[in-house]
């Protein structure tokens, strides 16, 4: 039996409660049987003790809540942290300064793991503490790439001084990556451009791309044989969707006469209310749902999902959700990056928001082809983003005893380049 230790600031949950990604949950839950797992979590997302016990059973792992020592108390929770932040003495608000208390280091030493994973590149000192093991620092994306893209987006200029704040965060993110220079470890990301950007800013090659696993799947029949097709837009109207969503509202208004009798639009989330009210004035059949307890159950009531994502990096788990459940997905290049799909074969990928009405009209007038594209999207994700497959190749690649070498970049390009559009 091989032994794995995971350190994470967020307790892994099936639907990434109060966190950016459920990557760790789904990858490690689906690990091969010969890997034992112990998780050390600071439980920053405040998951209840009862829920943690359930998660422990679901993923077959021991979960240990890390309690702060005096050092971390002053670096994370004490009011001095606010003062240091203002003086720019502690730019990460404690994450880069966070240390795993000695008690837990001793426990890990006794456990003698074959693999140690630090989830989130922000925890530099924890990585340094655990660098004498076979260490992988696992991130959902490269933070400097995110901020680099954000600085080119109109969101930066939506408020006074916002650009300066983002530029400052960009510099902090680069500094954090450079801190790994003398730490013997490997870096894992779920983004090809994330990997490339990391190499550019650090000059190091100790970083690899791995595909992101899909989450839960609900089997459904794909059928567009109906008078009105159902479209869903979920998530939030925030930094990630600000620019493209504002453009999409204007584009939908312009094409309302061609679309309003063909589609029912549903916006899932509280932040869409103003947009929904605005589009209702133009005669769209439109709904706004603030919250659902079962996200996947709501998703499969629809035929199409639009992802107006203008900023981001890594792989978007919500896009994988939709594709794996057979929804026909329309999204930006940013939304679809790192997913084993291709425009016209397994999704619709827009270069400009103005493309979306043409896609919607094509889908409505070519429902048979649209069903094939949706089915192709589902098959691609269920095959290449299968959690058991991803977990096995990820763990066996970083397990030094296997001798296996996985090239995610080569695999991705080979698979996607072989896909042919049916448009």
What are these regions (language model features)?
Residues 1-24, 41-43, 232-237:
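Nucleotide-activated donor-dependent transferases that construct or modify glycoconjugates
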Residues 23, 209-280, 288-295, 300:
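Conserved catalytic-core segment of nucleotide-activated headgroup transferases in glycan assembly
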Residues 26-27, 102-107, 143, 154-187:
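Membrane-proximal helix-turn-helix segments that form the acceptor-binding/catalytic region
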Residues 136-137, 167-219:
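Donor nucleotide-sugar binding/catalytic pocket of nucleotide-sugar-dependent glycosyltransferases
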Residues 300-314, 325-327:
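Acidic donor-binding loop of glycosyltransferase active sites
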Residues 318, 328-332:
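Short hydrophobic beta-strand element within catalytic cores of glycosyltransferases
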Residues 343-354, 362-367:
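Conserved acidic donor-binding segment of nucleotide-sugar-dependent glycosyltransferases
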Residues 369, 378-423:
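C-terminal amphipathic helix plus adjacent low-complexity
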């Amino acid at each position: 039996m091989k032994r794995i230790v995971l350190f994470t600031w967020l307790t892994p949950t099936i639907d990434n409660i109060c966190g950016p990604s459920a990557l760790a949950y789904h990858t490690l839950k689906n690990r091969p049987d010969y890997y034992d797992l112990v998780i050390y979590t600071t439980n920053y997302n405040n998951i209840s003790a009862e829920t943690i016990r359930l998660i422990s059973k679901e993923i077959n792992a021991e979960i240990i809540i890390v309690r702060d020592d005096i050092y971390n108390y002053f670096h994370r929770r004490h009011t001095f942290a606010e003062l240091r932040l203002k003086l720019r003495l502690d730019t990460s608000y404690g994450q880069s300064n966070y240390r795993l208390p000695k008690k837990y280091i001793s426990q890990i030493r006794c456990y003698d793991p074959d693999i140690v994973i630090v989830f989130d590149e922000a925890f530099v000192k924890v990585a340094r503490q655990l660098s004498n093991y076979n260490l992988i620092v696992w991130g959902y994306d490269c933070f400097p790439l995110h901020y680099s893209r954000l600085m080119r987006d109109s969101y930066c200029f939506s408020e006074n001084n916002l650009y300066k704040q983002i530029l400052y965060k960009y510099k902090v993110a680069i500094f954090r990556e450079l801190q790994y220079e003398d730490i013997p470890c490997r870096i894992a990301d779920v983004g090809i451009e994330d990997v490339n950007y990391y190499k550019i800013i650090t000059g190091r090659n100790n970083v690899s791309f791995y595909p992101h696993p899909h989450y839960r799947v609900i089997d459904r029949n794909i059928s567009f044989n109906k008078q009105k097709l159902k479209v869903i837009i979920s998530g939030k109207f925030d930094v990630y969707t600000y620019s493209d969503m504002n453009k999409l509202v204007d584009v939908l208004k312009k094409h309302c006469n061609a679309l309003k009798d063909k589609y029912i639009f549903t916006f899932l989330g509280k932040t869409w209310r103003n947009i929904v009210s605005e589009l209702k004035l133009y005669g769209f059949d439109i709904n706004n749902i603030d919250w659902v307890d079962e996200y996947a159950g709501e998703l499969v009531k629809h035929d199409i999902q639009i992802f107006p994502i203008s900023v981001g990096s890594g792989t978007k788990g919500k896009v994988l959700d939709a594709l794996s459940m057979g929804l026909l997905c329309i999204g930006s290049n940013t939304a679809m990056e790192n997913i084993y799909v291709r425009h016209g074969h397994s999704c619709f990928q827009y270069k400009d928001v103005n493309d979306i009405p043409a896609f919607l009209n094509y889908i409505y007038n070519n429902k048979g082809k649209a069903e094939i594209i949706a089915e192709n999207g589902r098959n691609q994700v269920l095959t290449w983003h299968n959690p058991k497959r991803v977990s096995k190749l990820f763990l066996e690649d970083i397990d030094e005893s296997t001798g296996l070498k996985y090239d995610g970049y080569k695999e991705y390009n080979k698979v996607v380049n072989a896909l042919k559009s049916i448009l």
